[in-house]
Design a protein with these regions (language model features):
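Histidine-anchored nucleotide/phosphate-binding helix
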Residues: 210, 214-222
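A short, basic/flexible loop-to-alpha-helix module at the beginning of a structural domain
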Residues: 186-198
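Short, surface-exposed secondary-structure boundary micro-motifs
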Residues: 50-53, 90-92, 135, 187
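Reductase modules of NAD(P)H-dependent flavoproteins
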Residues: 1-79, 84-85, 228, 232-327
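Ferredoxin-reductase
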Residues: 95-181, 198-199, 235-237, 262-266
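Short, conserved phosphate/pyrophosphate- and ester-handling motifs at nucleotide-, phospho-/glycolipid
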Residues: 127, 209, 297
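Conserved beta-strand elements of the Class I
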Residues: 201-202, 293
Length: 327
Protein backbone atom coordinates (compact mmCIF):
# COMPACT_ATOMS: atom_id res chain seq x y z
CA UNK A 1 0.00 0.00 0.00
CA UNK A 2 1.22 3.51 -0.81
CA UNK A 3 1.02 6.63 1.33
CA UNK A 4 1.64 10.32 0.67
CA UNK A 5 4.70 11.83 2.34
CA UNK A 6 4.81 15.59 2.84
CA UNK A 7 8.12 17.22 3.81
CA UNK A 8 8.25 20.45 5.76
CA UNK A 9 9.24 23.23 5.39
CA UNK A 10 9.84 22.59 1.65
CA UNK A 11 6.28 21.38 0.97
CA UNK A 12 7.62 18.59 -1.27
CA UNK A 13 5.25 15.63 -1.64
CA UNK A 14 5.84 12.11 -2.93
CA UNK A 15 4.40 8.63 -2.58
CA UNK A 16 6.01 5.84 -0.55
CA UNK A 17 5.21 2.15 -0.45
CA UNK A 18 4.82 0.72 3.06
CA UNK A 19 7.84 -1.52 2.36
CA UNK A 20 10.07 1.45 1.52
CA UNK A 21 11.88 3.59 4.03
CA UNK A 22 11.49 7.33 3.61
CA UNK A 23 14.97 7.93 2.18
CA UNK A 24 14.51 5.20 -0.46
CA UNK A 25 11.12 6.53 -1.48
CA UNK A 26 12.41 10.10 -1.69
CA UNK A 27 15.32 9.04 -3.93
CA UNK A 28 12.93 7.14 -6.20
CA UNK A 29 11.02 10.38 -6.77
CA UNK A 30 14.10 12.54 -7.24
CA UNK A 31 13.92 14.14 -3.80
CA UNK A 32 17.30 14.58 -2.11
CA UNK A 33 16.73 14.12 1.62
CA UNK A 34 19.94 14.59 3.58
CA UNK A 35 21.36 11.15 4.48
CA UNK A 36 24.67 9.36 4.85
CA UNK A 37 25.10 5.64 5.52
CA UNK A 38 21.52 4.56 4.67
CA UNK A 39 21.92 1.80 7.28
CA UNK A 40 20.87 3.48 10.54
CA UNK A 41 24.43 4.08 11.72
CA UNK A 42 25.26 7.77 11.19
CA UNK A 43 22.20 9.88 12.06
CA UNK A 44 22.52 12.31 9.16
CA UNK A 45 18.93 11.60 8.11
CA UNK A 46 17.32 12.63 11.39
CA UNK A 47 13.86 14.08 10.92
CA UNK A 48 10.77 14.80 12.98
CA UNK A 49 7.38 13.13 12.62
CA UNK A 50 4.77 15.90 12.61
CA UNK A 51 1.71 13.73 11.98
CA UNK A 52 0.76 10.25 10.82
CA UNK A 53 1.62 6.67 11.70
CA UNK A 54 4.95 5.01 11.00
CA UNK A 55 7.19 2.14 12.04
CA UNK A 56 10.78 2.81 13.09
CA UNK A 57 13.21 0.10 12.05
CA UNK A 58 16.43 -0.75 13.94
CA UNK A 59 19.22 1.82 14.18
CA UNK A 60 22.16 2.61 16.45
CA UNK A 61 20.36 3.59 19.71
CA UNK A 62 22.72 6.41 20.63
CA UNK A 63 21.75 8.36 17.50
CA UNK A 64 18.65 9.66 19.26
CA UNK A 65 18.63 11.01 22.80
CA UNK A 66 15.55 10.26 24.95
CA UNK A 67 14.48 13.90 24.62
CA UNK A 68 14.70 13.65 20.83
CA UNK A 69 12.61 10.48 20.77
CA UNK A 70 10.02 12.17 22.98
CA UNK A 71 9.92 15.09 20.54
CA UNK A 72 9.06 12.74 17.67
CA UNK A 73 12.44 12.59 16.01
CA UNK A 74 13.20 9.56 13.84
CA UNK A 75 15.92 8.04 11.67
CA UNK A 76 14.42 8.37 8.20
CA UNK A 77 16.49 5.69 6.45
CA UNK A 78 14.83 3.20 8.83
CA UNK A 79 11.36 4.79 8.99
CA UNK A 80 8.46 3.08 7.18
CA UNK A 81 5.06 4.74 6.57
CA UNK A 82 1.90 3.20 7.96
CA UNK A 83 -0.32 6.13 6.91
CA UNK A 84 0.11 9.47 5.16
CA UNK A 85 2.97 11.29 6.90
CA UNK A 86 4.05 14.88 7.50
CA UNK A 87 7.76 15.06 8.30
CA UNK A 88 10.22 17.81 9.05
CA UNK A 89 13.27 16.79 7.00
CA UNK A 90 16.23 18.56 5.46
CA UNK A 91 16.27 18.55 1.67
CA UNK A 92 19.72 19.21 0.25
CA UNK A 93 20.58 20.91 -3.05
CA UNK A 94 21.51 18.52 -5.83
CA UNK A 95 24.88 20.17 -6.28
CA UNK A 96 27.53 18.07 -7.99
CA UNK A 97 31.19 18.57 -8.77
CA UNK A 98 33.09 16.98 -11.62
CA UNK A 99 36.52 15.79 -10.51
CA UNK A 100 39.54 14.16 -12.09
CA UNK A 101 41.65 11.38 -10.59
CA UNK A 102 45.17 12.76 -10.11
CA UNK A 103 46.72 9.86 -8.24
CA UNK A 104 46.03 6.32 -7.01
CA UNK A 105 48.51 5.17 -4.37
CA UNK A 106 48.49 1.78 -2.58
CA UNK A 107 48.58 2.24 1.21
CA UNK A 108 48.05 -1.39 2.26
CA UNK A 109 47.23 -4.66 0.53
CA UNK A 110 43.56 -3.65 0.37
CA UNK A 111 43.61 0.16 0.79
CA UNK A 112 44.21 2.84 -1.85
CA UNK A 113 44.71 6.56 -1.48
CA UNK A 114 42.50 8.30 -4.03
CA UNK A 115 43.33 11.91 -4.94
CA UNK A 116 40.84 14.01 -6.88
CA UNK A 117 41.04 17.50 -8.36
CA UNK A 118 37.61 19.17 -8.60
CA UNK A 119 36.87 21.52 -11.49
CA UNK A 120 35.59 24.11 -8.99
CA UNK A 121 36.52 24.62 -5.32
CA UNK A 122 34.85 21.95 -3.20
CA UNK A 123 33.71 23.32 0.18
CA UNK A 124 33.87 21.03 3.20
CA UNK A 125 34.72 20.96 6.89
CA UNK A 126 37.38 18.70 8.33
CA UNK A 127 35.77 15.38 9.31
CA UNK A 128 33.02 15.47 6.69
CA UNK A 129 32.51 12.94 3.90
CA UNK A 130 31.72 13.13 0.19
CA UNK A 131 29.35 10.98 -1.81
CA UNK A 132 30.94 9.67 -5.01
CA UNK A 133 28.88 8.47 -7.97
CA UNK A 134 29.80 5.03 -9.31
CA UNK A 135 31.00 5.39 -12.92
CA UNK A 136 28.34 4.12 -15.31
CA UNK A 137 25.77 3.99 -12.50
CA UNK A 138 24.86 7.64 -11.80
CA UNK A 139 22.02 6.64 -9.47
CA UNK A 140 24.40 4.76 -7.13
CA UNK A 141 26.74 6.54 -4.72
CA UNK A 142 29.34 5.61 -2.13
CA UNK A 143 30.37 7.76 0.85
CA UNK A 144 33.98 8.33 1.94
CA UNK A 145 35.53 10.75 4.43
CA UNK A 146 38.10 13.30 3.35
CA UNK A 147 41.50 12.34 4.79
CA UNK A 148 42.96 15.86 4.88
CA UNK A 149 41.63 19.26 5.94
CA UNK A 150 40.84 21.80 3.20
CA UNK A 151 44.05 23.33 1.83
CA UNK A 152 45.31 25.63 -0.89
CA UNK A 153 45.97 22.79 -3.36
CA UNK A 154 42.25 22.10 -3.66
CA UNK A 155 42.88 18.36 -3.97
CA UNK A 156 40.62 15.90 -2.16
CA UNK A 157 42.14 12.81 -0.53
CA UNK A 158 40.31 9.59 0.38
CA UNK A 159 41.31 6.21 1.82
CA UNK A 160 39.37 3.48 0.00
CA UNK A 161 39.25 -0.14 1.18
CA UNK A 162 38.66 -2.84 -1.42
CA UNK A 163 35.59 -4.94 -0.68
CA UNK A 164 34.92 -8.24 -2.49
CA UNK A 165 32.00 -7.59 -4.81
CA UNK A 166 32.04 -3.86 -4.05
CA UNK A 167 31.17 -2.18 -7.36
CA UNK A 168 33.03 1.09 -6.77
CA UNK A 169 36.07 -0.29 -4.97
CA UNK A 170 36.53 -3.04 -7.57
CA UNK A 171 36.43 -0.44 -10.35
CA UNK A 172 38.88 1.77 -8.46
CA UNK A 173 41.38 -1.02 -7.74
CA UNK A 174 41.26 -2.79 -11.10
CA UNK A 175 40.06 -0.37 -13.80
CA UNK A 176 40.43 3.29 -12.78
CA UNK A 177 43.28 5.35 -14.17
CA UNK A 178 44.74 8.79 -13.67
CA UNK A 179 42.61 11.30 -15.57
CA UNK A 180 39.34 9.40 -15.14
CA UNK A 181 36.36 11.55 -14.14
CA UNK A 182 34.28 11.11 -10.99
CA UNK A 183 31.18 13.00 -9.86
CA UNK A 184 30.91 14.15 -6.23
CA UNK A 185 27.89 15.31 -4.28
CA UNK A 186 28.04 18.05 -1.66
CA UNK A 187 30.01 17.36 1.53
CA UNK A 188 27.94 15.98 4.39
CA UNK A 189 28.26 14.97 8.03
CA UNK A 190 28.52 16.57 11.46
CA UNK A 191 31.72 14.80 12.58
CA UNK A 192 34.12 17.67 13.25
CA UNK A 193 36.48 19.15 15.82
CA UNK A 194 34.76 21.10 18.58
CA UNK A 195 36.06 24.65 18.10
CA UNK A 196 35.06 26.00 21.49
CA UNK A 197 37.16 23.96 23.92
CA UNK A 198 40.72 22.89 24.64
CA UNK A 199 39.98 19.58 26.34
CA UNK A 200 42.48 16.79 25.79
CA UNK A 201 41.50 14.58 22.85
CA UNK A 202 40.98 10.83 22.75
CA UNK A 203 40.74 9.50 19.19
CA UNK A 204 39.80 5.91 18.34
CA UNK A 205 40.01 4.83 14.68
CA UNK A 206 39.44 1.41 13.13
CA UNK A 207 40.69 0.64 9.63
CA UNK A 208 39.95 3.42 7.14
CA UNK A 209 38.19 5.23 9.97
CA UNK A 210 41.67 6.71 10.31
CA UNK A 211 40.94 9.09 7.40
CA UNK A 212 38.83 11.78 9.13
CA UNK A 213 40.77 11.38 12.39
CA UNK A 214 44.02 12.09 10.52
CA UNK A 215 42.40 15.15 8.97
CA UNK A 216 41.36 16.43 12.41
CA UNK A 217 44.85 15.96 13.84
CA UNK A 218 46.38 17.70 10.82
CA UNK A 219 43.98 20.62 11.31
CA UNK A 220 44.83 20.83 15.00
CA UNK A 221 48.55 20.93 14.13
CA UNK A 222 47.99 23.59 11.45
CA UNK A 223 46.11 25.76 13.95
CA UNK A 224 49.03 25.53 16.38
CA UNK A 225 46.95 23.85 19.08
CA UNK A 226 48.96 21.88 21.60
CA UNK A 227 46.30 20.15 23.66
CA UNK A 228 47.25 16.50 24.25
CA UNK A 229 45.96 14.05 21.64
CA UNK A 230 46.02 10.27 22.14
CA UNK A 231 45.14 8.27 19.04
CA UNK A 232 44.38 4.56 19.28
CA UNK A 233 44.52 3.08 15.78
CA UNK A 234 43.26 -0.48 15.39
CA UNK A 235 43.34 -3.19 12.75
CA UNK A 236 42.60 -6.90 12.67
CA UNK A 237 46.03 -7.98 11.43
CA UNK A 238 49.35 -6.26 10.82
CA UNK A 239 48.96 -6.14 7.02
CA UNK A 240 45.78 -4.07 7.45
CA UNK A 241 47.67 -1.11 8.92
CA UNK A 242 48.76 1.84 6.83
CA UNK A 243 50.41 5.24 7.55
CA UNK A 244 52.23 3.82 10.58
CA UNK A 245 55.41 5.70 9.64
CA UNK A 246 53.53 8.98 9.21
CA UNK A 247 51.83 8.55 12.58
CA UNK A 248 55.14 7.72 14.25
CA UNK A 249 56.65 10.87 12.74
CA UNK A 250 53.85 12.96 14.24
CA UNK A 251 54.47 11.53 17.70
CA UNK A 252 58.21 12.27 17.40
CA UNK A 253 57.72 15.78 16.06
CA UNK A 254 54.88 16.85 18.37
CA UNK A 255 55.28 15.88 22.05
CA UNK A 256 51.56 16.43 22.72
CA UNK A 257 50.58 13.66 20.26
CA UNK A 258 50.63 10.01 21.38
CA UNK A 259 49.94 7.17 18.94
CA UNK A 260 49.05 3.63 20.02
CA UNK A 261 48.54 1.03 17.28
CA UNK A 262 46.77 -2.13 18.35
CA UNK A 263 45.82 -5.45 16.75
CA UNK A 264 42.67 -7.40 17.53
CA UNK A 265 44.19 -10.64 16.16
CA UNK A 266 45.79 -12.10 19.28
CA UNK A 267 47.49 -14.86 17.22
CA UNK A 268 49.75 -12.53 15.22
CA UNK A 269 53.07 -13.23 16.94
CA UNK A 270 54.99 -11.00 14.49
CA UNK A 271 53.36 -7.92 16.01
CA UNK A 272 55.29 -6.48 18.95
CA UNK A 273 52.83 -3.69 19.70
CA UNK A 274 49.58 -3.75 21.66
CA UNK A 275 47.04 -6.56 21.31
CA UNK A 276 43.57 -5.43 22.34
CA UNK A 277 40.08 -4.83 21.02
CA UNK A 278 39.61 -1.12 20.35
CA UNK A 279 36.52 -0.64 22.55
CA UNK A 280 38.51 -1.77 25.62
CA UNK A 281 40.54 1.44 25.30
CA UNK A 282 37.50 3.22 26.68
CA UNK A 283 37.47 1.06 29.81
CA UNK A 284 40.68 2.46 31.29
CA UNK A 285 38.72 5.23 33.00
CA UNK A 286 41.21 7.99 32.16
CA UNK A 287 39.02 9.85 29.69
CA UNK A 288 36.42 11.60 31.87
CA UNK A 289 37.60 15.11 30.98
CA UNK A 290 38.49 14.37 27.34
CA UNK A 291 36.80 15.24 24.09
CA UNK A 292 36.36 11.89 22.32
CA UNK A 293 36.34 11.22 18.57
CA UNK A 294 35.57 7.75 17.18
CA UNK A 295 35.42 6.48 13.61
CA UNK A 296 34.92 2.92 12.42
CA UNK A 297 32.32 0.18 12.19
CA UNK A 298 29.07 0.55 14.17
CA UNK A 299 29.78 -2.42 16.47
CA UNK A 300 33.10 -1.01 17.63
CA UNK A 301 31.64 2.44 18.16
CA UNK A 302 28.59 1.23 20.10
CA UNK A 303 30.76 -0.86 22.42
CA UNK A 304 33.23 1.98 22.96
CA UNK A 305 30.50 4.54 23.69
CA UNK A 306 28.81 2.22 26.19
CA UNK A 307 32.12 1.89 28.05
CA UNK A 308 32.86 5.62 27.88
CA UNK A 309 29.47 6.51 29.32
CA UNK A 310 29.88 3.92 32.08
CA UNK A 311 33.18 5.64 32.99
CA UNK A 312 31.54 9.07 33.36
CA UNK A 313 32.46 10.58 30.00
CA UNK A 314 29.72 13.06 29.12
CA UNK A 315 27.52 12.22 26.15
CA UNK A 316 28.07 15.66 24.62
CA UNK A 317 31.85 15.14 24.72
CA UNK A 318 31.58 12.10 22.42
CA UNK A 319 31.66 12.56 18.64
CA UNK A 320 31.49 9.64 16.21
CA UNK A 321 31.22 8.63 12.59
CA UNK A 322 30.00 5.06 12.18
CA UNK A 323 30.16 3.55 8.71
CA UNK A 324 28.98 0.23 7.33
CA UNK A 325 31.02 -1.64 4.67
CA UNK A 326 30.93 0.66 1.67
CA UNK A 327 32.35 -0.52 -1.61
Amino acid sequence: MEYEICLEPSGIRFMADERQNIVEAAKQHGVAIKYGCASGSCGDCKGTILSGASEQGPFMPLLLLPTERAAGMAILCKLYPRSDLRLHAEVVPKDTWMTEITRLTPLAWNVLELRLRPEWPYPYRTGQYARIAIPGRPDQWRSYSMATPPDTTGELVFHIRELPGGVFSQWLFHTAQRGDALTLGAAQGEFALSPDNDRDMLCIAAGTGLAPIEAMIQESIALGRTRPIHLFYGARKRADFYHLEELARWSRQYPHITITSTLSDMQDASWTGAHRLLPTVAASGHWKDHEVYLCGNPGMIEAAIDLLLSHDVRHDHIHFDAFAPNG
